[in-house]
A protein has these predicted regions:
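Rossmann-fold NAD(P)-binding glycine/threonine-rich loop
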Residues: 76-88
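N-terminal Rossmann-fold NAD(P) dinucleotide-binding loop
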Residues: 158-159
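Rossmann-like adenosine-cofactor binding region
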Residues: 54-59, 173, 177-220
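Short beta->alpha connector loops at strand-helix junctions that form conserved
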Residues: 31, 71-72, 88-99, 194
Length: 220
């Protein structure tokens, strides 16, 4: 069996041991990306990838291919419909980095409301010690208490973000095609997209990239 690993440094910056795959056959790793993906996976039985794009035309050149593993949650890099037509299963990692990504969303929110990086840089360059005022006040902090967060996509990551937002005293408006009544409470409710956009102080996008969600937030 031949196993091909595309995007190798991205999938494994160094802490993952891939040697166990050697037990199953020949393992080929690529550390750069090329347009002609089929030239690298044409004789593969199994393919691991992250950002490399694989089209149906590529898959049609892979007569031995039996399985594709996308080492990420999003799988828009693979023509899934084309793979299905050719009988090639495609797997992803549905709960990859859920807590970390939700935490990162809140970190970005706090940066916007408190300008932490800016003030840190100002203190490091000595402004605090050299300023004659009691404090420098370039930006007013924005308190999250009683603000409204709109969350588009209340899946695993959206739920983490919602939970932390509510802990800050925020109200949550959620828009999702699949509604879970168990997530509704006095501080969190589902609504339509127009209502969410009109009533939110901040909006978090936690939906997968599909044709129907692409450019969901636009100038209009």
């Amino acid at each position: 069996m031949k196993i091909v690993i595309l995007d190798h440094p991205r999938e494994n910056p160094g802490e993952i041991d891939w040697s166990r795959f050697d037990e199953y056959g020949e393992v080929v790793r690529y550390s750069d990306r090329v347009e002609d993906v089929a030239s690298r996976i044409g004789d593969a039985d199994v393919v691991f990838l992250n950002k490399s794009k694989v089209t149906k035309a590529d898959l049609e050149k892979c007569p031995n291919l039996k399985f594709i593993s996308v080492i990420a949650t999003g799988y828009n890099t693979v023509d899934v419909d084309g793979a299905r037509e050719l009988g090639i299963p495609v797997a992803n990692v549905p709960s990859y980095g859920t807590e970390a990504i939700g935490q990162h969303a809140i970190a970005l929110l706090l940066e916007i409301t408190n300008h932490i990086a800016y003030h840190d840089a100002e203190v490091r360059r000595g402004r605090k010690n050299n300023d004659t005022d009691w404090c420098f006040w370039d930006y007013s902090p924005i308190e999250l208490e009683n603000k409204t967060m709109g969350i588009i996509g209340l899946g695993r990551i959206g739920q983490i973000t919602s939970r932390v937002a509510q802990a800050f005293g925020m109200k949550v408006l959620a828009y999702d095609s699949f509604q879970n009544p168990a997530l509704v409470n006095e501080n969190c409710r589902y609504t339509d997209l127009d209502t969410l956009l009109a009533n939110s102080d901040v909006i978090a996008l936690h939906c997968p990239l599909f044709p129907e969600t692409e450019n969901l937030i636009n100038k209009a």
